Amino acid sequence: MNASPIIEIKHLTKRFKNATEDAVKDISCTVSRNEIFGLLGPNGAGKTTTLSILCGLFPPTSGSVLIDGRNIQKDLPYIRKIVGIVPQDIALYSSLTAKENLDFYGHMYGLKGKDLKYKIAYWLEKLDLTEASDRLVSDFSGGMKRRINLIAGILHQPKILFLDEPTVGVDVQSRNVIITHLKELNKAGTTIIYTSHLMEEAENFCTYVSIIDHGRILTGDSPTALISSHKGAANLEDVFLRLTNRKPRDQ
């Protein structure tokens, strides 16, 4: 693996207007190229806020972010061309078909013509959605919507993919399909930044994880190294529970 950082975060802090404390508190870390980087923590830990800053959805209060060597606040148009974003909230139009939604997102990323049609057909087939391509999204199950949501973020073959809880609320079969194809994307060269509170999934999916709570990163390493460094820990969830002083199912 090429270990040179594709993302560099230095002293990142975010406080929203009228808030009494920071949502993100002095975060510093790097993401290596072709890594699957997991930002893990309970609800309200600061995962989505951090990811939103990295995506350029709003600026930090202080600190800096470099993506592919570019400052996110100065080179946002370039950065938006090389990243894909899969938000936790389903970003699809329920009144359009799956194919129409993907056509819309493809044009937004500058794809058109035969190239766009090919990529839509390719990914619909890969994620077992070809037969549903002309159905309205409003008729889809949660798992199907998650898969279309994923395709919308990867049609343009991004160098970096941001995923916010991509498998939350879906059935096991859909979750396995999504994770399998994300691993294939990573093998093809896409760096993945992924937020989740699902520790078992993250342990099997990520090459590196950082655990965040109350806006601060508590630790970071490969899942195997984190488990080994905490005596008696059987898995990543044990590490998480110790560091955040939580009990099982208290996430």
Residue ranges and their predicted role:
Residues 220-221:
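ABC ATPase "signature
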